Amino acid sequence: ISAICEIVDGFKWKGPIGCGFPGVIRSQIIETAANLGGRNFVGVNLAEEIGRACGCEAWIINDADAAGCAEINFGIGKDRNEGVLIMLTVGTGIGVSMFSNRTLVPNLEFGHLRMRDKNIKKYVSAEKICSDAARKSHDLSWQQWASRFNKYLEYLYSLCWPDLIIIGGGVASKSEKFLKYIKVDCDIAIAKLENRAGIIGAAYEARKHF
């Protein structure tokens, strides 16, 4: 919060603040925060805390949802008015947002879907085997990683039947290395807004709500 206030003070900002958070948010209350240890955040109204500290209205949104809101309003999905769209933010983890006819279905947390890791013969979080961090830690070639990632996309497709899957996050800038190996029965596109998507989406949602 102190870092946010420092930015606000630096720009002499008086408008609303948007903040992406890696967890489930309901009515601005944090419900989960697994990637941050959880206990110090769960049950906290982070919007109120930030607003009180910075002297501005604040709006909290799941970080993957923020990235998706940016891409559907200002990026590759802006001309898609109908159908189901999924936005993936693939980097240290996997963030997932979904829109039905441009309406956000919040807090999916589909990066934590359970998938079978054939190496250890156990079911683990998809992030553990399909994120870019997993590619690096297991020293996988792009083709090897794409094979894993494609299974994850097929799993998502079987659950949600999307018309379009947008791939963003850190891997998006390396799409020429893996996209040719991706075979899913829907449109696949690379995000336009790159790592700015979460920032843009959080700001957009804050402005929309205030």
Predicted segments, located by residue:
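A charged helix-plus-loop insertion that forms the helical arch/lid used to bind
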Residues: I30-G43
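Small-residue-rich anion-binding loops in enzyme active sites
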Residues: C19-V24, G38
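Generic enzyme active-site microenvironment
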Residues: I61
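ATP-binding/phosphotransfer module of carbohydrate and carboxylate kinases, centering on a glycine-rich
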Residues: I1-I17, I25-T32, E48-A58, A70-V90, ...
